Amino acid sequence: MSAITPYDWAIIAFVIGVTFLCVFMLTVPLLLGGKSWGRAKQEQFESGVVSAGGARIRLSAKFYLVAIFFVVFDLEALYLYAWSTSVREVGWLGYTTVVIFVVDLLIALVYAFSVGALSWAPADRRKLAGEKIKVGSPTMNIAEITRFNSIEELVTDPTGQIPAQSSGRVKSKTTPALSSEKE
């Protein structure tokens, strides 16, 4: 069996340190934290107010497009950075590969622009501006599907109740039992 080298001791110390830190971070809150159980502890906390409906709202697809383009171009920048650090070692073959890569990216960018993937304007405004729409069904209105609902639309539903009232979690001001007794 071989002797343990200083490099091995460094790895062993690192593993022991990480294990101790994880155990410490998991046990200290259990020992110092308060313990109370009840129905109120299981509910969501929204600044002391009873939650009104779900927290999920529909966002415009524009934000997802920006996120996707950011990820794609960020990865491309990472690839170009890796190439730039080794430009002397890869020579002309590496240079040719990067030129093909960048040309391919530019072709993809021109294609995305030509099909309207980078346009934030709804299809109706593009029609009025004279642009010819090349992709999608003529009956499909993406702008209407992905439009952002205003806060006023999110607060009340068509019956005039807040979402929590329509779900039955919050009683309305006039309950059906009281209104039937008055009649």
UniProtKB/Swiss-Prot annotation:
Subcellular location: Cell inner membrane
Coiled coil: none
A cellular-component GO term for this protein: plasma membrane
Enzyme Commission code(s) on record: 7.1.1.-
Pfam families, per the entry: Oxidored_q4 (PF00507)
Membrane association type: Multi-pass membrane protein
A molecular-function term among this protein's GO annotations: NADH:ubiquinone reductase (non-electrogenic) activity
Spans through the membrane: 11-31, 63-83, 98-118
Catalysed reactions, semicolon-separated: a quinone + NADH + 5 H(+)(in) = a quinol + NAD(+) + 4 H(+)(out)
Record region (Disordered): 159-183
InterPro entries in the record: NAD(P)H_OxRDtase_bac/plastid, NADH_UbQ/plastoQ_OxRdtase_su3, NDAH_ubi_oxred_su3_sf
Superkingdom of source: Bacteria
Physiological role: NDH-1 shuttles electrons from NADH, via FMN and iron-sulfur (Fe-S) centers, to quinones in the respiratory chain. The immediate electron acceptor for the enzyme in this species is believed to be ubiquinone. Couples the redox reaction to proton translocation (for every two electrons transferred, four hydrogen ions are translocated across the cytoplasmic membrane), and thus conserves the redox energy in a proton gradient.
Name of this chain's protein: NADH-quinone oxidoreductase subunit A
